[in-house]
Amino acid sequence: ESNWQNIGGGARGEHHFWGEPLFGYYRSSDTWVMRKHLQMLTDAGVDFLVFDATNAYTYSDRVKELISVWYEYLKDGVNVPKLAFYTNTSSGDTMRRIYDEIYNNAALKKQYPRLDELWFNWNGKPMIVGISKEADSTVKSYFTIKESTWPNAGRTDNGFPWMEFGRSLTAEAIYGVNGRKEVINVSLAQHSATCRFSATAWYGANDRTRSWHNGKNDTSANAMLYGYNFAEQFDFAIKNDPEMIFITGFNEWVAQRQKPWGNESIVFVDCADPNNSRDFEPMKG
């Protein structure tokens, strides 16, 4: 703990960056960064983005700011990535709030007459990821609901995987109804052994880092720089040719320090250092 504090680490409950973004330590409300992200993602041919609302927070203010930027380019004829949401905790309530605050917001519709052109559609309706049995009739009628699918939980053909642990690189990692190959997830790294990336970064555990391939973490010099884990999964996805490849993730620079776990005094769940993180947004260094 004292060593952590001495190098500038924060207390439990505080949020920490695992690395420095290419555009510096920006705030999520920075519309200049939004424009640069839009440029990069559009140039890369990304079809749609999914907002992470899995913790029951909708980020509606940020989404509205992003919509204002996206809409400018839509009007100028740019084929911008479309937008969707992923829910999990309190999924039914969260989906309804997203519908009310964003999709069915009268003020937004008046301000942006072509707003519906920004939504990512699947099977003829805007797509949302959630727990369908929790959805009310309005949400079920408006959206195509793909089932929230956690890597350490069971799967369903209509699932939309956040990432894969044990099912990775197997037929179970291919999701679709009525024989379709609808979606495969590709992620940059997976905290598959401990659900605490800090455990592998600093305490000798064996989560799947960015350097993981052929069933183990590659410890050779600079292995992290080659994206072995990502490439192995992407090769699998390309070989199986699904209708969607869902990549986890983008813009995940910050994690909250958690309470100690056994002899691990410094604990982070979703990201800890460059090798134990899953953000493919460019960074400095």
Regions found by a protein language model. Name each.
Residues 1-285:
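Glycan-processing catalytic domains of CAZymes
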